[in-house]
């Protein structure tokens, strides 16, 4: 334990908290333009073709963003909204595209968990 005199001479250093989503710059979401839309394979125990896109954000960052849900309508030059949230089995993918916002359409035929995929309530 440090004495009061030692703390007066050299105070304790505050720990700096590093952000998991630096490209968002303390914003909840950011807008960007798709520069490349492609599929990639996940890490070892899993196997799939995960849909991802490279996005150039309005603040100049270029990030990789995951496209959730079954099927999508994104192409190069599509304007998308991205949010934070990593994909555990895709290294380097720390962002998700927001479905149902800007050029990214919601998921067709989605009945459950609709709010996460930009789907309006179905007519009953």
Curated annotation (Swiss-Prot):
Similarity-based family: Belongs to the universal ribosomal protein uS12 family.
Gene encoding the protein: rpsL
Gene3D superfamilies assigned to the protein according to its UniProt record, in alphabetical order: Nucleic acid-binding proteins (2.40.50.140)
Keywords assigned by UniProt, alphabetized: Methylation, Ribonucleoprotein, Ribosomal protein, RNA-binding, rRNA-binding, tRNA-binding
Protein name: Small ribosomal subunit protein uS12
Subunit composition and interactions: Part of the 30S ribosomal subunit. Contacts proteins S8 and S17. May interact with IF1 in the 30S initiation complex.
InterPro entries in UniProt: NA-bd_OB-fold, Ribosomal_uS12, Ribosomal_uS12_bac
NCBIfam families given in the database record: rpsL_bact
GO molecular function list: rRNA binding; structural constituent of ribosome; tRNA binding
